[in-house]
Amino acid sequence: MKIVVSRGLDLSLKGAPKESGFCGKVDPTYVSVDLRPFAPLPLGVKVTPEDQVTAGSPLAEYKLFSGVFITSPVDGEVVEIRRGNKRALLEIVIKKKPGISQTKFSYDLQSLTQKDLLEVFKKEGLFALFKQRPFDIPALPTQSPRDVFINLADNRPFTPSVEKHLSLFSSKEDGYYIFVVGVQAIAKLFGLKPHIISTDRLTLPTQDLVSIAHLHTIDGPFPSGSPSTHIHHIARIRNERDVVFTISFQEVLSIGHLFLKGFVLGQQIVALAGSALPPSQRKYLITAKGASFSDLLPKDIFSSDEITLISGDPLTGRLCKKEENPCLGMRDHTITLLPNPKTRESFSFLRLGWNKLTVTRTYLSGFFKRKRVFMDMDTNMHGEKRPIIDAEIYERVSAIPVPVALIIKALETQNFEEACRLGLLEVAPEDFALPTFIDPSKTEMFSIVKESLLRYAKENVVTSS
């Protein structure tokens, strides 16, 4: 199936590494296992500081679903268990042993029954890689998904391409074969043919995939690479019982690597990007999953007060505090550095704005349709919060036809029934990142949707499963 998306915004932000950039290798001293994505689920910690762990060792367990573990990607020693407000689990920090783990696993995918395969996924931390729709929560083992969507079309700013992720392996063919094994495992686990969404420029091993998966291509501006867009065009979610799972290309590689090679895939590709980073420092690295920023960034840049650190891309990533020695998030493959101006731009309202981004033609750049690299992207809000006046501008950049402003208003009043009627079942917080970015009212739509989905899932979805 060929999908063409016309709505969205083709972001060309300054600070991206060159696609041909060299993949250097960094073996970090510290890594963390990010537990923030599991906020809807109560977790039980299985380790304490000073415990020795190996790759694949259980670090945390779903309290409501015993036997489902979140595991360590590396060998090392647990040094800290970080908690936030109300003692919410944030991450488990590990002092990594040098080198790659040699902990060997032996699973024969062909001989495992579907029931045994599920136990392997739960025990080895593979089930924790899936996300569940509606409500964009960690997948629940009690649910049988209608469909599984595998995303190879992610086009968020600065996100490494599929080709870059294949740099982890000896050859592109080797990487794709590992991916095929991962797809085979998913197809057998759920007894279905998953949907694989890629772009036209990717050359997939279609002969190996066509018998075990549905293959689709998508073309269009950001956010055409979001799972919500794929689900909407291929098989829409129409009610709360319409459960689908989503998973990324990198996570399928982790599944295939365990079954084919017998080792936990503890490494990942990371992009160092952002307009605050000198061009010579914008590059791709091969490093451990969850690596600490201090091991990946130059000391003078990491400690600068004039730079904002983000784990992930600039639109959906997590804002990090330097004093906490931040680490990469669980699903993050980018470290973004943006300038943090201390003063407002003088007479900004009188400037032509040739290099400024606008959707409403507030600046001169809005009258030119040619693709341009927008300069000097920083954390300046350029004003304070205002009432929402023009609701139509959000629909121009939303890849799926949902009334963005009406959903936000329903969520702000906690009217979940109305929000679901308007399309909340089809969306995730990331779908509101672009409306938040171009919003003249400065409303934090991304945060509103994220907090609302978390609250609703805790009260209605997780407890009833």
Swiss-Prot record:
InterPro entries: NqrA (IPR008703), NQRA_2nd (IPR056148), NqrA_C_domain (IPR022615), NQRA_N (IPR056147). It catalyses: a ubiquinone + n Na(+)(in) + NADH + H(+) = a ubiquinol + n Na(+)(out) + NAD(+). GO terms for biological process: sodium ion transport. NQR complex catalyzes the reduction of ubiquinone-1 to ubiquinol by two successive reactions, coupled with the transport of Na(+) ions from the cytoplasm to the periplasm. NqrA to NqrE are probably involved in the second step, the conversion of ubisemiquinone to ubiquinol. Composed of six subunits; NqrA, NqrB, NqrC, NqrD, NqrE and NqrF. Belongs to the NqrA family. It is an enzyme of class 7 (translocase). It holds the Pfam family NQRA_SLBB. It comes from the Bacteria. This is Na(+)-translocating NADH-quinone reductase subunit A. GO terms for molecular function: oxidoreductase activity, acting on NAD(P)H, quinone or similar compound as acceptor. Its EC number is 7.2.1.1. Keywords: Ion transport, NAD, Sodium, Sodium transport, Translocase, Transport, Ubiquinone.
